[in-house]
């Protein structure tokens, strides 16, 4: 199968974050819905994992993803719209000016800082829903990176948070990792 080979290639990139590997594996699938014959712009909207906090610029997720996609034959520019410490509320506040007319697809990797801060899952859901709606209004394919809550906030919080990503992916017809 091609997928294990893709995952092995992603692991060799040296960026050991689960979401980065899954994003890279799914990004080519995300771009498959867009005409690959012309230059494409893919925006990665996220937090420090997207931004590349603490890494040399060339070693971050976005430059590694762009290099990987280009090696696979995609004429793509991946725009780093990651902000260290960002929450879903921050992503929601930035989404309209992030999705410029030249954007062809979007990766959304937000929610980790919401978890760290114990933000109500209903607020995180509403923010992610607004981000996906903004992308949908522009007809953009989206890859939503799912997160799972640890159990330290209790079972009700965990259940509410864990349901956000699959529910919103189904509602908006997005790809989900």
Where are these regions (language model features)?
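Short intrinsically disordered, low-complexity coil segments enriched in acidic
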Residues: 1-3, 33, 176-177
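Residues at the start of alpha-helices and the adjacent loop-to-helix junctions
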Residues: 27-29, 42-44, 83, 127, ...
């Amino acid at each position: 199968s091609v997928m294990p080979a893709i995952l092995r290639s992603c692991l060799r990139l040296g960026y050991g974050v689960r979401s980065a590997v899954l994003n890279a594996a799914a990004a080519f699938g995300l771009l498959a819905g867009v005409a690959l014959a012309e230059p494409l712009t893919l925006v990665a909207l996220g937090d420090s994992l997207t931004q590349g906090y603490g890494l040399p610029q060339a070693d971050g997720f976005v430059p590694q993803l762009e290099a990987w996609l280009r090696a696979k034959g995609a004429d793509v520019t991946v725009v780093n719209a990651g902000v260290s410490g960002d929450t879903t509320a921050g992503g929601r506040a930035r989404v309209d000016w992030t999705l410029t007319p030249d954007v062809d697809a979007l990766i959304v990797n937000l929610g980790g800082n919401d978890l760290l801060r114990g933000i109500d899952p209903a607020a995180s859901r509403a923010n992610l829903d607004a981000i996906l709606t903004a992308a949908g209004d522009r007809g953009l394919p989206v890859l939503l990176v799912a997160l799972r809550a640890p159990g330290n906030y209790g079972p009700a919080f965990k259940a509410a948070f864990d349901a956000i990503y699959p529910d919103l992916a189904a509602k908006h017809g997005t790809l989900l990792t």
